[in-house]
C-alpha cells in the first residue's frame, strides 16, 4: 500500500470515529465517551479536555482539528474507580464489535471475560483433590460476586 492510500485509509477511519463521537454527543451531551481501540481507551474533543483536566492525561492530536487523550486498557480498574469517585457518566464504545456499553455493563463483561480466562487456565489433569476443591471454592466466590453485585463488580 503506498503512502497516499495509507493516509486516506486512516483519514477515513478517524473521521468515522469522530462522526460516531458527534452522533453520540447529540444524544447525550453529559456522558463522556471512551473508545476502546486496541490496547487503549481514548477520548475525543471536549471529553478529552475534561478527562485531561481531571486526571492529567496528555492531550494529543487525532487529526489537525480533533484532539484525543487516553489510557491503557490495563489501567481500566484504576480509572474506573476514579471515574466513580468523580461521579462521571461514562459509556464505552468497543470498536472491534461496534458495541456501546454503559460503564457498569462493560465492567461486568470484563469480569466475566476474566472469569472465563481463570477457568480456562486450569489444567484439570494436574489438580490434586485439595486443589480441585480450592478451585471450585474460588470459582464459587467469583460467580457469587456477579450474582450479588450485578454490574457493580
Report the location of each language-model feature.
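Basic, polar low-complexity surface loops/patches
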Residues: 2-121, 126-138, 142-153
